[in-house]
Amino acid sequence: MDTDLYDEFGNYIGPELDSDEDDDELGRETKDLDEDEDEDEDDVGEHEDDHPGMEVVLHEDKKYYPTAEEVYGPEVETIVQEEDTQPLTEPIIKPVKTKKFTLMEQTLPVTVYEMDFLADLMDNSELIRNVTLCGHLHHGKTCFVDCLIEQTHPEIRKRYDQDLCYTDILFTEQERGVGIKSTPVTVVLPDTKGKSYLFNIMDTPGHVNFSDEVTAGLRISDGVVLFIDAAEGVMLNTERLIKHAVQERLAVTVCINKIDRLILELKLPPTDAYYKLRHIVDEVNGLISMYSTDENLILSPLLGNVCFSSSQYSICFTLGSFAKIYADTFGDINYQEFAKRLWGDIYFNPKTRKFTKKAPSSSSQRSFVEFILEPLYKILAQVVGDVDTSLPRTLDELGIHLTKEELKLNIRPLLRLVCKKFFGEFTGFVDMCVQHIPSPKVGAKPKIEHTYTGGVDSDLGEAMSDCDPDGPLMCHTTKMYSTDDGVQFHAFGRVLSGTIHAGQPVKVLGENYTLEDEEDSQICTVGRLWISVARYHIEVNRVPAGNWVLIEGVDQPIVKTATITEPRGNEEAQIFRPLKFNTTSVIKIAVEPVNPSELPKMLDGLRKVNKSYPSLTTKVEESGEHVILGTGELYLDCVMHDLRKMYSEIDIKVADPVVTFCETVVETSSLKCFAETPNKKNKITMIAEPLEKGLAEDIENEVVQITWNRKKLGEFFQTKYDWDLLAARSIWAFGPDATGPNILVDDTLPSEVDKALLGSVKDSIVQGFQWGTREGPLCDELIRNVKFKILDAVVAQEPLHRGGGQIIPTARRVVYSAFLMATPRLMEPYYFVEVQAPADCVSAVYTVLARRRGHVTQDAPIPGSPLYTIKAFIPAIDSFGFETDLRTHTQGQAFSLSVFHHWQIVPGDPLDKSIVIRPLEPQPAPHLAREFMIKTRRRKGLSEDVSISKFFDDPMLLELAKQDVVLNYPM
C-alpha cells in the first residue's frame, strides 16, 4: 500500500478513483484480508497452545465458565431464575424419603426345616392346621408364638436380648406394648412322635377394641386356642371370645398360660394351685354350655384339649407330654394310660403302686399335684432360691447339664434355660391341636355351610367341601395388609378350592356382588404370592386349597373382604358372607385437613385406613363432614395415627368424640297415620309400636332370619314371642336390612284391601320402610326396636300410577309419621366395663363410675388373687377419659376395659320444646334427650327441631286437629 496516498490519520488524500476500479480494488483487498484471516486462524489453531492469550478476543465474546450444557450434557434441562420462589421451609434439593412402618427381616432367617419341606407340606391338607390364638389382653399369646419362633428359628433369639414380640411387626405396636393387628405365622412343628405338621397360626390382639381383627382370623381358621392367664382367670374378653368361637362353629381348645405366676407371684401351695386351675376349666365349660348346643364340646386335660404353659419360661405341657417325660426318664411306662390318671380326684398309693379314687391317707395329694405341680414347684424353687449349693446336683438328677457360664446367668434367663431343657419342644401344644382341631379337609364342609352364600350341594360347593386342589379356584380374603411404605395393600385369605398361581387372571367379587347384580366385581391379575411368617414372607409360585396366602395385585377393588375366583367357567360362584363382628362401632369423630387444599390426600388416606381396619366405618354427613366410627378410644387413636403418619401424611383436625344414637318408640301410635302419593292415586295407612324385649337382638344375631319360609317364621314368633299366627306369617321385611332390628308387618284384611294390588307394590313399600328406618326423623339416626303395621292401602289400578317413584317416598313418609305419633325416644349406647383393682381401691371405682352416670352390677374377688373384679355399665358418651380418670383416683392401681353392650333409652322427651338448652352448662337427666337431639342435628347441618310438614300431608294434619292431638313439633 502506497503511504503517500494517505495522511497520518489513515485518510485517503490521493487522486480521485473510478468507481469500477474502486470496487475491484476493494474486492481484492477484502479477498486478501479474508485469506489473511484464514491463515491467521489456522496459525492460531496450530500455535494456540504455544502462545495462549496472544489472540485478540472481544469483551463480549470472552468465556470465563463452561455452559450448563457442556457441564451436565444436552439431556439435562437447566432453569435460570433470578428470584427465589421456594419457601424457606422447603429444601432446594429434597432428600430421598423412605417410609417404613413395619419391622421386617432383610433376609430369610435360618430355620430348622428346609423351605422346600414347608412347600411340600402345603400339598397335603391332612397335615395342615389353621389355628387362631386368642385371649384377653396380656394373657401371653404373642410371647407363646415367640417360643414357637425360637424353636423353629435357632438364630433369632441371639439377635434380640429383650422380649421378642415377633408378631408385633408395627412400630406402633412395639411402642404401645399392645397388639393392634392380627399377624399370621406359618411354621412346621413336630408332635410328640416326631411327625411334622404345617401350622398356620394367627396371633390376634387381646384388647377388646380390636376384636374385629380376631373375627377376621376366626373366619379362615378351623379351630381356636383360647389363652387364659392362670392368675387372672376368665376375663371380659375371654367370655366374649368363647361365645364368638362357638357362633363361628369352630373347635375350641384352651391353653392355661402363665402358670409360673401361681408359684412365683401369688405363692399358692400346690393344692391351691390345682383348685385354681380346675376352677378355670370349670368356668370355661360353663360358658361353653351356655352358648353352645353341642353337649360333646367339653374341655378337660384328660381329653387332651387343655394344655398348661408359661411362655416367659418356655414351659408347655399337656398331661400326655408330661407323662412322656416320666416314661423317657424311668422307662417301661405306658405314658398314655398314665396321663389318664393325672387329673381329677385320683390318688397314687405308694404301697400298692396303684391309683385310687379315695385318698390312701389324710396327707395324700391328688395325682396332678404329686406328679406335675410338685416337681414343677421344686424346679422353680431350686433355681430361684438355691443356685449355688444344691441346684447342680438336682439338675444332674433330672438329666440337665449346664456349663459354669450358664449357671452364672441371672435368675430369669437361667430359669428359662432350665425349663427349656426339661420340657423340651412344645410338642404337647402340637398334639392338642392335631387331635382336637380338624384339618382343612375335615373342617371345610362345616365352614362352607356357615360362610358360603351359595349352595353347598353344587359342584363348586362340593369342591370346596372336599378341599380339592384341582377344583375351580375359590379364595376368601378377610384381611388387607399394607406394604412397608403404606402405599399399597396385599390381600390375605384362605384358598378353599383349586390352586392360585402367581400371574393368574382372577375375578374379584366384592361384598355387594350377587348373581343378579355383577357390578361389584373386577378382573385382576395376581402378582406375587407369599406365605407370611410375621416379619418375613416366603415367596411361592402357587398355593393349593387348605392354605393361607398373601396376594399381591388384587387390592384395588377390595374394601373389606372379597371372594376370588376364576374369570371364566365359574359363573355360578357366589360370595362368602361379610364378616359379622361381635361388637358395634359407636364412637364417632369428625375429621378435616388443616389445609383445605389437601382434602384429596385425606380422602385417599380415609380409603386406605378403611381397608386396614375391618370394622372401621367412614362416611360423609349431609353437611359435608367426614366422619369415622370406631369401637373405642384406643381404636380411633390408632386409626388417626395411621391416617396422619402412614397414609395421608398431612395435618388433620379432629373434633371432640361423640357417639351414635338410635331412635325408638315407647308406645303405640296414638292414631292411624296415612300418606298419599304425589299423584293422589295411592294411600298407605300405618301405625308403629315397640317390639317385644329381646326380639331385636334375636334378629341381629340371626336367631331368626327373614329368608325362612312363612311356616317356620310363624312358628318361631308364635312360640317364643306369643305372636298371632296370622301376623307372624304376614311379616314382610326386617329393616333397614336383613338383620335390622325393625319389622314391617302386613296387617291388612283381604276383605278391605286388594291383596293382589298390594303385593304388586310390596317391594316399593319395603324399600321405603328400609329407607325410613335407616335414617330416623329425630336426628337421621337408625330406628331400632319398632314394629310397623300396614293397616290399609289404596293402590291405583294402572301400573303407571303405582310406580316406585310414587310409592317409595310415600312409604317413607308414613313410616316417619307413624313413628312420631308413637312417643318417640332416643337410645344411647352403653358400655360394659370390667375393672381390676386391689380391695382398697374399690370405693374409688364406685365414685368415678357414679360421676359418669355409671352403675356397678357385680363386685367380687378374683379367686386365689388379691385383686377384685368390678363389673359395671356406663353410657358411652360419658366414657371419654374414664380410664385416665380411674387411674388418677386409684394411683394407677386400677385397670379397666370397656366394650359396647346394649342400647338404653335416654331419659327425657327429645321433642319437649319447653326445655331450654343453656350453653356450657351440664344438663339435668330429664333434659339429656333434648340436648342430644339438638346437638346432633346441629352437627349434621339440620334444623334444630323436627318439622312435621315434611312427614304429614294436609289431610293428615286436619285429622290431627280433629283428634285434638297436641304436637310439640314446629309446623
Swiss-Prot record:
Covalent link Glycyl lysine isopeptide (Lys-Gly) (interchain with G-Cter in SUMO2), residues: K63
CDD domains linked: eEF2_C_snRNP, EF2_II_snRNP, EF2_IV_snRNP, snRNP_III, Snu114p
Cellular localisation: Nucleus
Protein origin, superkingdom: Eukaryota
tr-type G domain residues: 126-408
Keyword terms, alphabetized: Acetylation, GTP-binding, Isopeptide bond, mRNA processing, mRNA splicing, Nucleotide-binding, Nucleus, Phosphoprotein, Spliceosome, Ubl conjugation
Chain residues that bind GTP: 135-142, 203-207, 257-260
Any single GO CC term annotated in Swiss-Prot or TrEMBL for this entry: U2-type precatalytic spliceosome
GO biological process, one term: mRNA splicing, via spliceosome
InterPro entries: EFG_II, EFG_III/V, EFG_V-like, EFTu-like_2, EFTUD2_N, P-loop_NTPase, Ribosomal_Su5_D2-typ_SF, Ribsml_uS5_D2-typ_fold_subgr
Record location of the Glycyl lysine isopeptide (Lys-Gly) (interchain with G-Cter in SUMO1) cross-link: K63
Example GO molecular function: GTP binding
Location of the region described as Disordered in the Swiss-Prot/TrEMBL record: 1-52
Pfam families, per database record: EFG_C, EFG_III, EFG_IV, EFTUD2, GTP_EFTU, GTP_EFTU_D2
Family recorded in the similarity comment: Belongs to the TRAFAC class translation factor GTPase superfamily. Classic translation factor GTPase family. EF-G/EF-2 subfamily.
Protein name listed in UniProt: 116 kDa U5 small nuclear ribonucleoprotein component
Lineage: Eukaryota, Metazoa, Chordata, Craniata, Vertebrata
